[in-house]
Regions:
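Sec-dependent N-terminal signal peptides
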Residues: 3-14
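Boundary at the C-terminal end of the N-terminal hydrophobic targeting segment
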Residues: 16-21
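A short beta-strand-turn-helix
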Residues: 28-48
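Conserved helix-turn-beta segment immediately C-terminal to the redox Cys motif
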Residues: 46-47, 62-86
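Thiol-based oxidoreductase modules, predominantly thioredoxin-like and allied folds used
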Residues: 80-96, 113-118
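Short, internal strand/loop/helix patches
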Residues: 100-118
Length: 118
C-alpha cells in the first residue's frame, strides 16, 4: 500500500510539472499498439494518467517485476480512470519497440493500460 501511494504521488507530481491540476492538457494524438489513432480529446472530462514507459529502464522493470504497476493500473482502470502508457523511444534508440513487441510486453507483464501509445 505504501508503494502504491508513493507511486501515485510521483505520477501526480510528474503530471503537474507542466499542467496544473484542473487545467486542460494540450491535445495530442498517437497510434496505439493496434495502429489506431488515439487522441487525448477522446477522453475529455475523464481523469487520465500518462505513463511514459521504457521496458529496459531498471526502475520500470522493478515496478513491473513486482507487479506494483499492474496493480495500480488495474485499480485505476477499474475506477474508470484512463491509463495511457506511452513508449516514446525513437527507432534505433534504447527502449524502442514495435507495435507487436508492445502487445507482447503488455501481455507478458499482465499490464492493464487503456492504451499503449507509440
Amino acid at each position: 500500500m505504501r508503494i502504491k501511494i508513493l507511486s501515485l504521488l510521483l505520477l501526480s507530481f510528474l503530471a503537474s510539472a507542466s499542467v496544473k491540476n484542473g487545467e486542460i492538457a494540450p491535445s495530442f494524438s498517437l497510434l496505439n499498439q493496434d495502429n489506431e489513432s488515439v487522441s487525448l480529446d477522446e477522453f475529455k472530462g475523464k481523469k487520465i494518467i500518462l505513463e511514459w514507459t521504457n521496458h529496459d529502464c531498471p526502475f520500470v522493470k522493478r515496478h513491473y517485476d513486482t507487479e506494483n504497476m499492474q496493480t495500480i493500473q488495474k485499480d485505476m482502470t477499474d475506477n474508470e480512470i484512463v491509463w495511457l502508457s506511452i513508449i516514446s523511444s525513437a527507432k534505433g534508440k534504447q527502449g524502442y519497440v514495435t507495435k507487436e513487441q508492445a502487445k507482447e510486453l503488455t501481455s507478458e507483464r499482465n499490464a492493464h493500460p487503456t492504451h499503449v501509445l507509440l
